[in-house]
Amino acid sequence: MTLRPSFDYTSAIAAVCSDMCYRIPELRHIDMNRVAVGFSQTKNSEPFGVFASTTPLRFENGESYCNRRGRFWTLQQLFRPDGVEYLYILYFYVPRFIELPLSQKLDTIVHELYHVNPFFNGDLRRFAGRRFAHGSKKQYDKIVNGLVQYWLKSNPPNDIWEFLCYNYRDLMTKYGKLSGTRIPFPKVIPAKTN
């Protein structure tokens, strides 16, 4: 019996993200070397709920600390093995994300990347109004769809994104096992004061 290697799903998604950030001008400010990509397991694959999320590792305007009710707080830091600090974490919720059709997977990936602040400062892109993370959902979705279409028209290599065509069962049949990086959600913690 020959053992098949597992398929590293988070590394594959990170490669798609890198290609999108290279090809789409509106995403070129993103340095994927400073964006961690992980997965979180969902209880089921129902097409309801969250498919992915972007977690900023800084507060508003890229600040490392915030003051709430007279106390200073910071976020837990996350580093690459070479010591470079991550500024964002992209989480993909599996198997829920995997069960989406290709078009929705691409929309979801670009949707999350577009949350990254244009100054790449660890904060989210902010819009005017109460819904600072999206502004108008209709307008946000229109922008995302346009960026996905731009990426597809740029003819990205099939070997980078073809795995997104598969659902969970197809991936298991093709690769035998899925693997990926699990990253604990960072906590807001009291800041050390000198």
Language model: regions and residue ranges:
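Metalloprotease/metallohydrolase-associated module, dominated by Zn2+-dependent proteases
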Residues: 1-91, 119-194
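Generic "edge-of-domain/loop-turn" microfeature
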Residues: 44, 97-99, 115
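Active-site recognition of the HExxH zinc-binding catalytic motif
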Residues: 105-119
